[in-house]
């Protein structure tokens, strides 16, 4: 009898350890966006095209349900946030009416009650791609991202070049062979008020803008971790935005993922521990750049980090590893943990699984 009970206990523990965090996404999912509201997860765009899905994490039979398609066309690098029961989607990269790749600065709103989308008559004062979005006191805040004019111009040139490989090589060399400050990544902080649909200036980084940073916020503090300083060159910087009191303060924490940094990483909080995991970058690019090579990642292979770092006692500690390196998925707060949905692995392969990272007593637990 005791042996039978013990065997059942082992089987149940094994099943729990191997149980998937969430069901696989309906399609391999990367470069999209997502948000969570009342334990219901919403994901869409990126490699899912115009599709959006939701999943009730508290349901007994968890499954992804297709929602109304996004009306703005396929997008990558859009961001999203829930405010007062509605889902807002900001910008992204996609095709315009002429078929040219461009950065958008528009806003769409999804109403879960009616399963319907509407494009708002509101445009950010700059393009939104590679940016981050977070919510504070009922407003959405946006910072970072590529320069709309420079990025759009690059893709216009590529379109003109067609299949002319010589022209394409020349365009790429011209585009990548510049210093970081010459790309004018967005270092402004913008606020969006959903009640008025108006954009406002909310501040400005005393350092520089990034693209593809990881973002997480709790209470009056928001952290921006790593990202690109220019196309192909990452930064290991960590910025903290402190909304405590009447004046926004920008602080710089110790770097992480040094020396090269990563973009497309994942950030979250578990039991008050700040987590940073994964991301992709080019090892050796920082040294190349410091040695005067502006096209810093030329000839380098993109690598995907498995590292999990915790911010503890004023410094970053590597505290665990993902089962495989990944980047460019969605990271959300769930069950007092960091939930990662999808992403891409080596070679840019989009994946369908989810990962849950939890911290207790500064010890990391990873559930796949």
From Swiss-Prot:
Q: How does it assemble?
A: Homodimer.
Q: What is this protein called?
A: N-acetylneuraminate epimerase
Q: Which residues form the signal peptide?
A: 1-19
Principal location listed in the UniProt entry: periplasm
Q: What is its EC number?
A: 5.1.3.24
**Which species?**
Shigella flexneri
GO cellular component entries: periplasmic space
Disulfide pairs here are: none
Starting at the broadest rank, the lineage of the source organism is: Bacteria, Pseudomonadati, Pseudomonadota, Gammaproteobacteria, Enterobacterales
């Amino acid at each position: 009898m005791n042996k039978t009970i013990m065997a059942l206990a082992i089987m149940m523990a094994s099943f729990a350890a191997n149980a998937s965090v969430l069901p696989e996404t309906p399609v391999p999912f990367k470069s999209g966006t997502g948000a969570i509201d009342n334990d219901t997860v919403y994901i869409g765009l990126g490699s899912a095209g115009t599709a959006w899905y939701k999943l009730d994490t508290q349901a007994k039979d968890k499954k992804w349900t297709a929602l109304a398609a996004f009306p703005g066309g396929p997008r990558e690098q859009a961001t999203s946030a829930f405010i007062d029961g509605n889902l807002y989607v900001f910008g992204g990269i996609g095709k315009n009416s002429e078929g040219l790749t461009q950065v958008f600065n528009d806003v769409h709103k999804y109403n879960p009650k009616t399963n319907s989308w509407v494009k708002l008559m509101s445009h950010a004062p700059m393009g939104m791609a590679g940016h981050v979005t977070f919510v504070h006191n009922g407003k959405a805040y946006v910072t970072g991202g590529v320069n709309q004019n420079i990025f759009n111009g690059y893709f216009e040139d590529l379109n003109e070049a067609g299949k002319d490989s010589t022209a394409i090589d020349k365009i790429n060399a011209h585009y990548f062979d510049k210093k970081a400050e010459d790309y004018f990544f967005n270092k402004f902080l913008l606020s969006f008020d959903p009640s008025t649909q108006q954009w406002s200036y909310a501040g400005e980084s005393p350092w520089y803008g990034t693209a593809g940073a990881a973002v997480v916020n709790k209470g009056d503090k928001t952290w921006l971790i790593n990202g690109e300083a220019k196309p192909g060159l990452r930064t290991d910087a960590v910025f903290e935005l402190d909304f405590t009191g009447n004046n926004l303060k920008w602080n710089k924490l110790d770097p992480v993922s040094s020396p090269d940094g990563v973009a497309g990483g994942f950030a979250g909080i578990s039991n008050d521990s700040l987590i940073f995991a994964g991301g992709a970058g080019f090892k050796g690019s920082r040294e190349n750049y410091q040695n005067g090579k502006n096209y810093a990642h030329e000839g380098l292979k993109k690598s995907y980090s498995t590292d999990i770092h915790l911010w503890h006692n004023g410094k970053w500690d590597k505290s665990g590893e993902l089962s495989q390196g990944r980047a460019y998925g969605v990271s959300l707060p769930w069950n007092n943990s960091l939930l990662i949905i999808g992403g891409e692995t080596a070679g840019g392969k989009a994946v369908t699984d989810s990962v849950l990272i939890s911290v207790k007593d500064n010890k990391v637990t990873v559930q796949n």
